[in-house]
């Protein structure tokens, strides 16, 4: 099987793919193209993932995988959604984003939410395929745990009775939105080999 090229410079995302594609060579796009960047102008996770994978597949003339992910809070009509990384504004960090979300949920009873990841796979002269993974949870009123990043310290998973920041990387890989989407992609690729 060919190398798995991921259109990201985020080492954490690359590691998530490597954890599931253990027997294959997974590389980030920066190993093939310097300064690859695509503006995420899509209104959905799928649109943003497609923008990245299609641009990278065109630039490299080979199959490329990209993803877009974020947090959707039901009581906030899906916010922060595609703006999860920049919810508090450009130049702000994870703490600023968490603070804004907690403020927006201050008097809200329904704190149900989900992390969403859409993986897009594009190749020259092939239809782009997408794979969606989710994990459901509840937004806490305060931070718990030190692992992970982003909204993990306030995303409580009832089945585990912990936030995403309180579980190990191995546990997270088994239940996370990105892990779920990567497993769907892997099943598809394994099926492709048997055709």
UniProtKB/Swiss-Prot annotation:
Record-listed substrate binding positions: 8-13, 69, 149-152, 172, 177-178
User: Which reactions fall under this protein's catalytic activity?
Assistant: XTP + H2O = XMP + diphosphate + H(+); dITP + H2O = dIMP + diphosphate + H(+); ITP + H2O = IMP + diphosphate + H(+)
- GO function terms (MF aspect): dITP diphosphatase activity; ITP diphosphatase activity; metal ion binding; nucleotide binding; ribonucleoside triphosphate phosphatase activity; XTP diphosphatase activity
Q: Name one Pfam family in it.
A: Ham1p_like
The record's comment on cofactor binding reads: Binds 1 Mg(2+) ion per subunit.
Name the GO cellular-component terms: cytosol
Q: Which residues form the active site?
A: 68
Chain sites annotated for binding Mg(2+) = 39, 68
Disulphide bonds annotated for this chain are: none
Keywords, sorted A to Z: Hydrolase, Magnesium, Metal-binding, Nucleotide metabolism, Nucleotide-binding
Gene Ontology biological-process entries: nucleotide metabolic process; purine nucleoside triphosphate catabolic process
Q: Which Gene3D superfamilies match?
A: 3.90.950.10
What family name appears in the similarity comment? Belongs to the HAM1 NTPase family.
> Assembly and partners?
Homodimer.
Q: Name the chain's protein.
A: dITP/XTP pyrophosphatase
Q: Which organism is it from?
A: Staphylococcus epidermidis (strain ATCC 12228 / FDA PCI 1200)
């Amino acid at each position: 099987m060919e190398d798995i090229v991921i259109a990201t410079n985020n080492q954490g995302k690359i590691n998530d793919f490597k954890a599931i594609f253990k027997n294959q060579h997974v590389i980030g796009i920066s190993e093939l193209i310097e300064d690859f960047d695509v503006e995420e102008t899509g209104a959905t996770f799928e649109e943003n993932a497609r923008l990245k994978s299609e641009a990278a597949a065109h630039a490299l003339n080979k199959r490329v995988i990209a993803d877009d992910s974020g947090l959707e809070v039901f009581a906030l009509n899906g916010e922060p959604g595609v703006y999860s990384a920049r919810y508090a504004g450009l130049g702000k960090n994870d703490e600023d984003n968490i603070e804004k979300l907690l403020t927006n949920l201050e008097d809200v009873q329904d704190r149900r939410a989900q992390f969403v990841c859409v993986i897009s796979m594009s190749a020259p002269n092939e239809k782009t395929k997408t794979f969606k993974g989710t994990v459901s949870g509840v937004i806490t009123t305060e931070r718990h745990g030190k692992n992970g990043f982003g909204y993990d310290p306030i995303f409580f998973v009832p089945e585990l009775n912990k936030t995403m920041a309180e579980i190990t990387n191995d546990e997270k890989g088994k239940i996370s939105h990105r892990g779920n989407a990567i497993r769907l992609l892997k099943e598809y690729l394994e099926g492709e080999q048997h055709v």
